[in-house]
Amino acid sequence: MTEQNHILDAVYGVILARKATQTENSYTASLMRKGLDSVLKKVGEEATELVIAGKGGVADEVVYEAADLFFHTLLLLSYQDIPLERVYTELRRRFGISGIDEKNSRTT
């Protein structure tokens, strides 16, 4: 893996640092101070913006909105004290399994 492949880890590390220091001029810290509902609202907004960009079909807009959604998803993980490695573990677990088989294996 190249250093570029670790960008999610790097961004997550910055988010964790901003959470810990609660710097006044930090967007991340500011959003976290507003609470879970504000964090969830932002994730929802970014997901919607990605869907709209996808419908528009302009690759640069899709990439931009996907990056926003990734960032805010990482922020939510941090807010809830969920290590990024847990997402990696889940993705590795699913890798190579058909989506239908994976869904059927879940407990309800």
Curated annotation (Swiss-Prot):
Gene3D superfamilies named among the record's database cross-references: MazG-like
GO CC terms, sorted: cytoplasm
Broad class of the protein's primary localization: cytoplasm
Enzyme nomenclature, EC number: 3.6.1.31
CDD domains given in the database record: NTP-PPase_HisIE_like
Domain of life: Bacteria
Gene Ontology molecular function: ATP binding; phosphoribosyl-ATP diphosphatase activity
Enzyme class name: hydrolase
Pathway given in the UniProt record: Amino-acid biosynthesis; L-histidine biosynthesis; L-histidine from 5-phospho-alpha-D-ribose 1-diphosphate: step 2/9
Family as reported in the entry's similarity comment: Belongs to the PRA-PH family.
PANTHER family in alphabetical order: HISTIDINE BIOSYNTHESIS BIFUNCTIONAL PROTEIN, HISTIDINE BIOSYNTHESIS BIFUNCTIONAL PROTEIN HISIE
Protein name per its UniProtKB record: Phosphoribosyl-ATP pyrophosphatase
Originating organism: Pelobacter propionicus (strain DSM 2379 / NBRC 103807 / OttBd1)
Encoding gene (name): hisE
